[in-house]
Amino acid sequence: MRYLLPAILLLGTQIASAQSILKDKDDKELSVLLNEVVITGTGTEHYLKDAPVQTEVITSKALEQYQARSIDDLLSGLSPSLTFHDGDMGSHIQLNGLNNDYILIMINGKRMNGDVGGQNDLNQLNPANIERIEIVKGAASSLYGSDAIAGVINIITKRNREKMELTNTSRIGEYGDIRQSTSFGFNYGKIKSVTGINFRHTDGWRNTDLQWDQNQLKSGSTMLTVNRSSNYTLSENIEWQVNRKLDLTAEGTYYERWVMRTHGPWKYQANDFYYRNYTFTVGSKYKLGKRNYLAADLSYGRYGYFYDYKLNEHTDYFLDNDRHERITYFAGQRIKQSIQKQILGQVKSVFYLGEDHILNAGIEYQYNHLESPHHIDGDRASVYTLAAYIQEEWTARENLVLTAGVRGTQHKETGLNFSPKISGLYKPGEHINLRASYALGYKAPTIKELYYNYTGVIGGGALTAYHGNTDLKAQTSQYASIGIEYVGQKFQASLTGYMNYLHNMIELVEIFVTPDEKFLEVEKSKQYKNLTKARIYGMDFTFNYRPAKSLSLAGGYSYADPKAQYPNKGIDYMKYLPIDATSSHNANLNILWQHSWKLYRLGIGIYGRYQSTRRYINDNNADGFQTWRINTAHSLSLIHISEPTRPLYISY
């Protein structure tokens, strides 16, 4: 058991009022699991066991017991299909062989905007504030548009249901790992408000003193595997029920992050990283009666990325004057690298037509503007996307539901595209569900893939130049899946097989280093290019077994074989090679025991995860590994100060 890594974590302190007692929660958990309402697969509400599109749900019970240190830790620990590796640019996510670019991440059904280097920064989210997570795998472009070729992750946050509620979660771990989150919510008449602050810090760590420099592996490096960093998020969410038909919402966030990089042998790290983001969102929902409704949302986000200089640096950029002097940055300066602005508007309607039909239609507009001195020709660029979609759910028979939809998208650079999808749910028996789907996916190149150029070092590797490409085409895919699910009182399991064929897949491809780059000591050069083809074959298996009220077992296995044709491989350009940084085998196993006494509940969990070798085209493969974690959770019921009949819970 070379990679066995047990860890006993006494995590978090939560103080919150609740309306149910501990024993009632135990008795109801099973029925809640079977009747969980999900929305992500079709955009309309369904019980999990009746959802026309296969949906994986991480429940509030699993989240509470796991006590994750981060969203990355939570998702990789509880879903076998997802893998992560932390980086300064954000959360490097993979789902069934495809990376972050092909995964749409949503918060309460709304697109999570803003990224740096193509990576969403999940550090902004507080794990303690999540109610549940819904994961839909496979192309969902007909409903959600670009970024949804691999699937959708919808993070549903908790809503304030009390007149007044204060929640605090604190976590301290090795390597200076500190997580602190506090939220305060109240209800006043028809208005609900939740104010939150989330803080995270790590001193960083490293697993080797070896570093790649000038085509040699040298020892004595001071570079960290994970850099020292701190970040915090301030958030405010307001809901106003104007009347029985109209609901209004408003939300704002402010986020700052500092990443401190070490300076020492082999690399001259003249600067640290600094990020500053803020977002604003307003929304409305108007109920038309009989479950029909109209909804509209408008959001604006501004995402800043800066260098904080700690040493002087003489750059290769020139001042705009007649003397052609080089630009010099001095210690203490904060220099803008990029400012990304995004506007997203959406109008959606859902109509229940009789007992057998649900019509879902909407329009969306998205505008992206990127400003980056010295990295973009003319220092700035922008793209827009305009889309319309329609989807019909038809209950053809009591045990047969068919769903069909299509989306039309107009993109500034790649033009018009149509993305249809059809799926079906058939119930041959009381406990058996059969599902099948076929979809065409669509993914427009990002603004950074089109226009952005930069040079940097990632993970202690070679100094590499990265180049955008304005000749990129839109990526398309053909996705098909078939699955079977068993839903019983004590045992639930699902098995799904899928194929995903991608055309014009965009990847960073190694190109020749130019003489100018060699002069700047650049060791590698890469450019975004459309690959000829890519294909992924895979299967997912998940299960949940509850032999007794106090004991549950859950787990899963995910197999993926992602391969692509690389245009720069000479005579082998037609050969399918593994897609960079992918692993074929991923599995997890969770065992949870819980017992409740009159005022106290104890939970003990064992969590294991296995990941096979991660493969690379031009670099060495990363070894497979397994991790094991032992976790205890304790809940104590006290007397509520203001209302003695209501219990107060302390969990740790």
What are these regions (language model features)?
Residues 227, 332-348, 381, 387-389, ...:
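Outer membrane beta-barrel strand-and-loop segments of large Gram-negative receptors
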